[in-house]
């Protein structure tokens, strides 16, 4: 949420080949408990870091127009991979797994990469028009214990930045134990609070502990790896056209369809272009003159339309609650620097068949990503009215 023994059949299924399940409404039995025998969500069916390495190697060896790289290492020394597909003038940066207990974006991203690197004519057109740069799993250390945070003690952090000795720990560092939004097994940082649009920022003790509406400090090697990749893309392309961050949200979020006497409908995904309550106070239009507000709204509309192409099964995409103020998020940081920034929060479907559940969520992510990519390939992106963003219904709660 913005605030692994893999299923091989899902991991290597193209965007077009995932079977559409039946329409889903928000039923109490689905929302209040898992089906009998399912228990809570587990790591089964999701990628472990070693499996990501094998997938990346397979993409490089069998895909067309694919290049891979290690953009950094996690705090525990695991490689963080990027996959590049295509050579077009427009660049799309896709990122998954920043919160490692929200893992279906990784499945979806692998599916999209497999599809776009195949020999079909459409994939060739995409590769000629667009450069896709993807980080399938930004937080490999969190994937091992299946937690939101990375694995990094405050002592680890002070060892990296001795100037922080004696200062309080950052507000987004957690010790093991239940939280409202998480239940870390090992100490670590919420990576999606560690970003800062000032790429030259150096951590300062006087800025600790910080708070939710202030910028991050790049205390984690994972956030720095994402920043460094983005910097390289800026240097190559001048502007990173689109940035997408893939997340999961709680199951059975709903929205009001506007019809009287009908129950609220279940939303398969919530999306957002809004990450700062007062962008100007963070330098939008001044220090960051390319602030991508209109472009972000266009990209969200393209994602919305992409999911609608999946038919009624995937109807009901909503806007994430529009009161975010998360200056330390990747979305806010890259939007300030000029990218069309999109948050995608697909719901964790609770269904008796785990393959159905994972496949449904991954498919929603895939359709949304391809909606954006197709609009760039077909040169319709700039024709999208950004004010249509307001037509997307807002999620309840």
Segments (PLM) and residue ranges:
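C-terminal accessory segments enriched in acidic
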Residues: 1, 27-47, 205-397
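Secretory targeting and sorting signals
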Residues: 1-22
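Short glycine- and acidic-rich boundary segments immediately preceding or forming the N-terminal edge
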Residues: 24-76
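Zymogen propeptides
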Residues: 69, 74, 81-86, 109-111
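Structural recognition of the beta-strand scaffold that forms the well-ordered cores
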Residues: 70, 81-83, 91-95, 133-136, ...
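Short glycine/proline-enriched loop/turn "hinge" motifs that connect secondary-structure elements
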Residues: 84-86, 181-184, 199, 333-339
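Enzymes and membrane/adaptor proteins characterized by extended Gly/Ser/Thr/Asp/Glu-rich
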Residues: 87-116, 295, 299
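Active-site/substrate-binding loop(s) of hydrolase catalytic cores
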Residues: 89, 104, 111, 117-286
């Amino acid at each position: 949420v913005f605030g692994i023994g893999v299923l091989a059949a899902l991991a290597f299924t193209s965007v077009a080949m995932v079977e559409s399940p039946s329409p889903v409404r928000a039923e109490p039995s689905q929302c209040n408990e898992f089906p009998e025998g399912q228990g809570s969500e587990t790591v089964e069916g999701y990628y472990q870091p070693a499996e990501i390495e094998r997938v990346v190697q397979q993409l490089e060896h069998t895909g067309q127009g694919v290049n891979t790289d290690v953009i950094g290492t996690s705090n525990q020394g695991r490689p963080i991979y990027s996959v590049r597909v295509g050579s077009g003038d427009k660049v799309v940066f896709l990122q998954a797994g920043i919160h490692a207990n929200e893992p279906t974006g990784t499945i979806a991203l692998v599916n999209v990469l497999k599809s776009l690197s195949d020999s079909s004519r459409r994939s060739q057109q995409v590769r000629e028009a667009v450069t896709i740069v993807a980080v399938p799993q930004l937080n490999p250390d969190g994937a091992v214990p299946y937690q939101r945070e990375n694995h990094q003690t405050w002592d680890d952090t002070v060892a990296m930045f001795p100037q922080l000795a004696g200062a309080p720990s950052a507000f987004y560092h957690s010790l093991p134990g239940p939280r409202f939004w998480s239940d870390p097994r090992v100490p670590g940082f919420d990576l999606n609070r560690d970003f800062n649009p000032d790429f030259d920022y150096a951590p300062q003790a006087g800025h600790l502990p910080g708070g939710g509406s202030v910028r991050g400090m790049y205390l984690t090697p994972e956030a720095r790896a994402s920043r460094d990749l983005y910097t390289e893309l800026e240097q190559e392309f001048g502007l990173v056209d689109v940035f997408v961050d893939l997340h999961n949200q709680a199951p059975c979020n709903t929205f009001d369809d506007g019809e009287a006497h009908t129950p609220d409908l279940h939303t398969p995904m919530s999306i957002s272009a809004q990450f700062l309550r007062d962008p100007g106070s963070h330098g939008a239009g001044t220090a960051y003159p390319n602030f991508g507000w209109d472009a972000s709204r266009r990209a969200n509309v393209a994602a919305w339309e992409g999911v609608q192409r999946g038919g009624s099964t995937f109807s009901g995409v909503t806007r994430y609650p529009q009161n975010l103020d998360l200056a330390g998020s990747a979305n806010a940081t890259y939007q300030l620097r000029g990218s069309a920034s999109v948050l995608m929060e697909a719901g964790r479907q609770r269904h008796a068949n785990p393959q159905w559940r994972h496949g449904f969520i991954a498919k929603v992510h895939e359709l949304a990503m391809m909606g954006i990519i197709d609009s760039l390939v077909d040169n319709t992106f700039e024709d999208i009215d950004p004010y249509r963003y307001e037509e997307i219904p807002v999620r309840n709660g």
